[in-house]
Each structure stands twice: as C-alpha cells, then as structure tokens.
C-alpha cells in the first residue's frame, strides 16, 4: 500500500518575511528599553534607600555625617553591593564644631541643627575618653602584674652610693677633692620628642629607645638583646605557659617594631622555659609530657601567625617536629649565647653624673652634706673605689718571673744558685757549681768539676755585676749545660740560632755526653763577656754581649770545627785540649805555622778510629757494634761538620750502601772533593791526602755473565 501524501505547506512571499522581521526587531527594542528603564528606577530607589539608612545609622550612633565620606565606609558599601553608588557630596566650608579627619575631603550636604552637631561632638569625645581610660587601666594592671611576677633589673650602683662610703671613712673632705680626679664631660643631649600619634604608656617612645617585650621598659641598644621573630615568640610562649602573661598581652608584645629584651631577664626566661616544659636540659625534652608539648605548639603557632600578619608576611604553620627542635636549640644555645663575655652588660661611666653633681654645689661643701646619707661598703669595694678615684689599675702590673719558671727543670737548681750568688750583694767572682749540686741528666752520676782560675791573658778584670747585665740567666744556663757535658756548639746553636740538636749524617742522636777536658770561665774584654777554656790562650770560644750570643762566620767555624766530646778517642786530657785549641785558633784566624794547619783536618778524621797503632803494650780489643765506625760514616761526619749537612741524594746513597768508599758509582771521595773544592780548597787538599781503601772496579756489561745481567739489568745512577 502506498503512504498518504503530506499536506502542502503555505507559501510565504518575500514581502511577508520582511514584515515579520521588522515586527520582531521593534518588539526587541521595546523590551530592552523597558528593561533599562526598570533598572534605572531600581538603582535610584536603592540609592535613596542607602542614603536614608546611612543617615539613620549616623544619627543613632552619634557620629557626624562626615563619616559617610570616609574611604573605609565606601569600601564597606561596595563590598556588600558592587553596583551601589557612592554618596555624592558637595564642597563647603568646614564647620568648626564638627570634627573632620581631613579638611580637603568633600563633606556631605546634610541638614543638621546646631543642637544635633554639638551632641554628636560630645558623644565622640566621650567615646575617645572611655577608650583612653580602658587602655591606661589595662596598662596599669599589666605593669602591676609584671612587678609581682618578673624580677626587677639588677640595680646598678649609682655614683652617690659608691662615693658615700669614701666620704664616711674620711677619704675625701670636700666635693672639690673628688672633682679633681674626674675629667669633665659634656652633658648628655636631651631626648627627642615622642612620635606623633603614639598611644599613652608608662615609657616615652624615642627614635633610639626600644621597649622590652617583657617589662615594657625603654631600652637603649647597648642595654638590650636583639631578638629574632622566632626567639621572641618562644619567650612569649614560655611566659604564657608559665602563667606570667595572658594571650592578649603576648599578642600585643609581638607586634612591636623592634623585638628587644633586657639583659637582666635572661635567667628569668630560662626559669620560665623550665617551668613551661618541665625540663632543664636538651636531653629532657624527649621525656616531657605530651600535653605540654601540644599546648606549647598551639600557642607558638598562634603568636607566630599574629606576628606574620602584623609585618605583612605569609603565614606558615610550623609542624610539631620543627617546634620541638626549636625548643631543643634554645636549651642548647642558652649558656654560650647568654652568659659569654660578648653579651655582657657594659658598665656605665659615672663621670657625667658626678660632674653635674659637683658643679651644682660650692667646692667647700662637705661630701656627707652633699650626699645627705651614709652607706657602708665592703673592704673590696673600698679598695676598688680608691683605685677608681686615684686612677690606678694594678691588674696588668708585670711581675718578675722566677728563675725556675724560665730555665729547664734539669738545670734549674744549679742555675738558680748561680743567679742568687751573683746578685748585687754577692762577690764578683763567677760561680761554678760543685760536685754535690750537679747531676748528670743522662748517666745520673756525679762528676768532679774543676774550680776556675784566673787566666794570664787579662782575666783579672773578671766581674759579674747585676746592674750592668739585665738578666745573666742565659750565661749561667749556657755554662751549666757545658759543664754538664754538652757541646758548646750544640747549646749556642740550639738556644740562640734556633738550630736543632746536632746530629750526624744519618740523623742519629749522639751518645751520652762526657765532661770536657777543661772547665770554662767568664772573662770581660772591652766591655764584652766571653766564655773560654781555662787553660786556653787563644781567642774566646763564645762571644756574649747582653742577652745575645754574637754569631759570626768565624764563630760558626769555631763551633762546628771543634771536635765533639763524645767522639774523642781515649787519650790524655792535654792532647784533647790542645787539639781543641788548635781548632779554635784556626777558626778565628790566629797566626799559626803551616805544620799546624796540615795537622788540623787529619785530627778530625781520627774520631773513634777503628785501627790505632801505638807503641804501648795494650791489647787490642775486637771491634764491636758500639765502637766500630765505617769509612762512610767517618767521611760523612767530617763533611757534615765542615759544611753543615750533606745533600739529600748523597745522604740517601749513604744510607742504602754499606760502604761508601767501595761504591764509586754512587758517590766517591774524589767526586765529593771535586764538588766542595771551590768552597774549602784547604779541606779538600787534606781529604785528598788522606789514605783510602783501594777502589773496586766492577766488570762491564760485556764482561758480565748472563746470570749477572739478569740479576742487575740496569746500571746504578750516578747521583
């Protein structure tokens, strides 16, 4: 079956379409016009209602109509309704009976009788007065509460209190007598005016004064402790938890511009912290009650939020573990930060107050009459007062040190006795300790010391005067060490030239010292003191002037070329002393014969010889480890004595090789002589003339066997 045909639609012409569109546009225009007119009517009605309500609020509150023009009031109106119109006013002359915030702000045109204006002014004044009374009452109650809870600052003893004791004891008769002991100082400048618009308080706000966050006392910068935000919050939190502060008082204190605290509240803050958390040390924080920790955390976050909002910072919620660590840091840093000398309270200077006090009265006024009361001081305070007035301070007076503190403990007894015997009342003869007063520090046995005798070469002028010499301790010390058996070269270089103890080429310490062959004595030549051997006729060995040992090239040569006492062979005393004097004469350039010069260096080579030929029928003992000296050691000691020390590579080669003379590839005597020939040709000549062992020439690589080449593939380096 076929579906029925759809009905035919009416055909609309183009003219009809245009007419329909025109009607629709006209209808839309009318709707928009009606809507805009209704909105305008609604806004006008809203503005009228706002004005009526605002005037009603002003009249009921007793405030002038000028409050409608305040910016804060207009912002409040826009907050509730953004499309609300601002109250329009007209400029007029300011009324003297109406209080205005600014004279340039336009005033609202209102119709108000004089009675209403006076009433509004009276209500405004009463409101301000009541607010001031409430604030002053609150400040008074807070200060009274502080006086009962917080300990007062430690009172500084004033000038009147300090000087009254001196007056009562009869130290000074009049004020002019005290005035002469103090310098005049200008009077301190007057404090600046208070800041405009500041709230009334018990202290005066100045640009250089800062109130304490606990006692509200005006403080100078040098009288207070600067605190960070976190430190101030912790202090105020402890005050709230311990019951000394209310939360409102702590919030008011945290809003201060500069957070400072008195020096005297440091111990009190620690007591508050201990009372708040029931802990006295950092280790006890982990054991404190949980409720204390949670309560302190809440108060800390609340005060921190108030301080951040007041300073325009982004508020932060401190977690519990950070708060706990901050409390631990306070206990950890309490002693070093609050008790050390860097934060100690500076002592005030009483000069300004004293000068002003004494200038206001005549000079003949009695001190008791000036002060009008008497006070008592202890003996220590009395002495301190007398020192202050007289300008004497004996804290830094230098005291003479004892001789036992300066010298070594080993030789203090002998040197002290020598110093006492050579004082002003003692005879002029030099003192040499006897056998009962000296002990050998190494071998611990007594020796027999020779008493000094006058020398024939002008030793009659021997004198020891303490007035001419400041401290003769150095001379006595040096003489005592030498008499103990130490070498003069070692002592002079050790004490005066800062040269370490003399060692041989291998760095070995010499054996136990033995006493010298002849004792030493002091002599004075041309106003200078000298140390020399008693039986010697040559120049002195050590030159001493005042407290300084004169060290010259000739003196150095004399000290270094003199043979060591412990290295001397077992010969007679006369031969050893003569060899020593020969070395002294040679070093000081004394005129000698050529034969004596030729015998100088071979004498040095005979220190502890292994083979000694003598005509006396003495049995030769076999060499031991203690008395055997290798040729390398002998040559190294001789070169070290003459030129200071060997080079590093030469010393290493000597240490590594058992026999220096049998190793020509490392360092032979001829090569050493060639190196030092320019420095001391005379010594090189003597060393060259000395007998030496025959050289051992090793085979070349061509003569070596294959096994020897494998064992020693590389030749040894030369130096």
From Swiss-Prot:
Record note on disruption phenotype: Greatly reduced nuclear accumulation of lin-56 protein and increased mRNA levels. No obvious vulval development defects. Double knockout with the synthetic multivulva class B protein lin-15B, dpl-1, efl-1 or lin-35 results in a multiple vulva (Muv) phenotype.
Chief place of localization: nucleus
Gene this chain is encoded by: lin-15A
One protein family per Pfam: Lin-15B
Known role: Synthetic multivulva (synMuv) class A protein. SynMuv proteins are required to repress the induction of vulval development. Acts redundantly with SynMuv class B protein lin-15B, and lin-35 to negatively regulate vulval development, most likely through antagonization of the Ras-signaling pathway. May also negatively regulate vulval development in association with other SynMuv class B proteins such as dpl-1 and efl-1. Regulates let-23 basal activity. Required for the correct expression and/or stability of lin-56.
Keywords on record: Developmental protein, Differentiation, Nucleus, Sexual differentiation
Biased segments, Basic and acidic residues type: 693-719
Listed name of the protein: Protein lin-15A
A Gene Ontology BP annotation from the UniProt entry: protein stabilization
Organism: Caenorhabditis elegans
Region: Disordered, residue numbers: 179-199, 419-464, 559-626, 684-719
Subcellular location: Nucleus
Extent of Low complexity compositional bias: 570-579
Taxonomy, superkingdom: Eukaryota
CC annotations in GO: nucleus
Note: The proteins lin-15A and lin-15B are produced from a single precursor mRNA with non-overlapping transcripts where lin-15B is the upstream transcript and lin-15A is the downstream one. The precursor mRNA is cleaved at the polyadenylation site and a 22-nucleotide SL2 leader sequence is trans-spliced to the 5'-end of lin-15A to allow its translation.
Compositional bias annotation for Polar residues: 604-617
